[in-house]
Amino acid sequence: MGGFTSIWHWVIVLLVIVLLFGAKKIPELAKGLGSGIKNFKKAVKDDEEEAKNEPKTLDAQVTQAKVHESSEIKNKQEG
C-alpha cells in the first residue's frame, strides 16, 4: 500500500527483469544506460558553457557594428 517499499516488491521486479532480458543481457543494458546518461550530462554541460559564452560574442558584435556605423556617419558628415 505504500508503493514499492517492501523488499519483496523489489525482488519480484528484479525477477521479472531477469526473466525478460536474461542474466547475460542485464550488464550490457546497464552499461548502455550508464553511457547514455554520461553523454546526456556532457551535452547539457556543453550547452551551458556555450550559453555563457554566447552573450559575450553578441556584445562584441553589437559594439563592432556601432563603431562601424559611427565611422560611416563621420565619413558622410566630412564628405
Curated annotation (Swiss-Prot):
Residues 48-79 are annotated as: Disordered. It holds the Pfam family TatA_B_E. It is found in: Cell inner membrane. The keyword Nucleotide-binding does not apply. GO terms for molecular function: protein transmembrane transporter activity. The chain crosses the membrane at residues 1-21. Its main location: membrane. The Tat system comprises two distinct complexes: a TatABC complex, containing multiple copies of TatA, TatB and TatC subunits, and a separate TatA complex, containing only TatA subunits. Substrates initially bind to the TatABC complex, which probably triggers association of the separate TatA complex to form the active translocon. Belongs to the TatA/E family. PANTHER family: SEC-INDEPENDENT PROTEIN TRANSLOCASE PROTEIN TATA. HAMAP family: TatA_E (MF_00236). This is Sec-independent protein translocase protein TatA. It comes from Helicobacter acinonychis (strain Sheeba). The gene is tatA.
